[in-house]
UniProtKB/Swiss-Prot annotation:
GO biological process entries: chaperone cofactor-dependent protein refolding; DNA replication; protein refolding; response to heat
Keyword Repeat: yes
Alphabetical UniProt keywords: Chaperone, Cytoplasm, DNA replication, Metal-binding, Repeat, Stress response, Zinc, Zinc-finger
Composition skew (Basic and acidic residues), residue ranges: 35-50
Co-factor binding details: Binds 2 Zn(2+) ions per monomer.
Entry's transmembrane regions: none
Protein name: Chaperone protein DnaJ
Organism: Janthinobacterium sp. (strain Marseille) (Minibacterium massiliensis)
UniProt domain comment: The J domain is necessary and sufficient to stimulate DnaK ATPase activity. Zinc center 1 plays an important role in the autonomous, DnaK-independent chaperone activity of DnaJ. Zinc center 2 is essential for interaction with DnaK and for DnaJ activity.
Length: 374
């Protein structure tokens, strides 16, 4: 099975502090520690899973690489020498597992273990316009591929892997646990059943090398922030003939200077002049598909919201367009000329003489103040 998200394992968000991550790990470690659950294989697996997640997220450099690229951003424990098991360690056990190595699947009875490749994650930042209209792009994803020098065998050219002398090529060894006989992943070949007496110099016997893979990604119109696009088979390669993992492209939408998105709806603030608010009239507003206009009535107050139907974003699932909500902001004039100030004073005097009919909210507020002090 594919590796789970490290943040999900610990039950914390991606913005969690170091202390929160440490606290979450301690809680899980206490709950699932093998000494407290001697007969629970599930608890033991969860304990190892939590430990691996903590080891990655507690290291600032590893956490940064994981946040950017997912599991592919964290280097496997690549080792050289005769074992050729460095790459296998990336899928393997933290402490050693007498019940069989965690994180993979078992092949034929007594044969080498087969592992599905790890899933990869790639964060892709796009604009709101690209999200609304769809977008085709290419991305470069760091991934592990078969070493071309040794064709993935891990052996030096001209040589071949040989059966592991510890497990006889089976990838597993049998251990006696009291009255029970159980299979354990071979500690020498790490489940592959093979060792390389002469490891490949390019990949140090791992059979894998890290490189950037260029992929085309089609972003559907209407996609929202946080949605993921799955690219099957473009994750890390499997082990011992296992299938490759998948690539998940997680969408991040840049903040727009004018619009705020709420699902398929859009919101924007529209500044209008004092005169336009008082007299009413037609105003022109931008949308993601061009310009639109609507009429505001006389006496429009600041904060009034106008709804333009179907001027939002067409939903990626619903197929229907959301609405555009225009929030009117009446702008108070500044840097007035003397003539403008004179006219404003005259206007203010006329408003006072006209009584509450010109400023009903002001009249209501004054009445409330008067009642408050009486």
């Amino acid at each position: 099975m594919a590796k789970r998200d490290f943040y999900e394992i610990l039950g914390v968000g991606k913005s969690a502090s170091d202390e929160e991550i440490k606290k979450a790990y301690r809680k899980l470690a206490m709950k699932h520690h093998p000494d407290r659950n001697p007969d629970s294989k599930g608890a033991e697996d969860k304990f190892k899973e939590a430990k691996e997640a903590y080891e990655m997220l507690s290291d600032p450099q590893k956490r940064d690489a994981y946040d950017r690229y997912g599991h592919a951003g964290v280097d496997p424990n690549m080792g050289g020498g005769g074992g050729g098991g460095g790459f296998a360690d990336a899928f393997g056990d933290i402490f050693g597992d007498i019940f069989g190595q965690a994180g993979g699947g078992r092949g034929g009875r007594g044969g080498p273990q087969v592992y599905r490749g790890a899933d990869l994650r790639y964060n892709l930042e796009i604009t709101l316009e690209q999200a609304a209209h769809g977008y085709d792009t290419t991305i470069r994803v760091p991934s592990w591929d078969n070493c071309e020098t040794c064709d993935g065998s891990g052996a030096k050219p001209g040589t071949s892997p040989v059966n592991c002398t510890t497990c006889g090529g089976h990838g597993q060894v049998r251990m006696q646990q009291g009255f029970f006989s159980v299979l354990q992943t071979c500690p020498k070949c790490h489940g592959s059943g093979k060792i390389n007496p002469s490891p490949c110099g390019t990949c140090s016997g791992a059979g894998k090398i890290k490189r950037n893979k260029t992929l085309e990604v089609k972003i559907p119109s209407g996609i929202d922030d946080g949605m993921r696009i799955r690219s099957s088979g473009n994750g890390e390669p499997g082990m011992n003939g296992g299938p490759p993992g998948d690539l998940y492209v997680e969408i991040r939408i840049k903040q727009h200077p004018m619009f705020q998105r709420d699902g398929d709806d859009l919101h924007c603030e529209i500044p209008i002049s004092f005169a336009k608010a008082a007299l009413g009239g037609e105003i022109e507003v931008p949308t993601l598909n061009g310009k639109a206009s609507f009429t505001i009535p006389e006496g429009t107050q600041s904060g009034k919201t106008f709804r333009l139907r179907s001027k939002g974003i067409k939903g990626v699932r619903s197929g229907y367009a959301g609405d555009l909500f225009c929030h009117v902001i009446v702008e108070t004039p500044v840097t007035l000329t003397e003539r403008q100030k004179e006219l404003m004073r005259e206007f203010e005097q006329l408003t006072i003489e006209g009584g509450s009919k010109h400023s009903p909210q002001t009249k209501s507020w004054k009445d409330k103040v008067k009642e408050f002090f009486e």
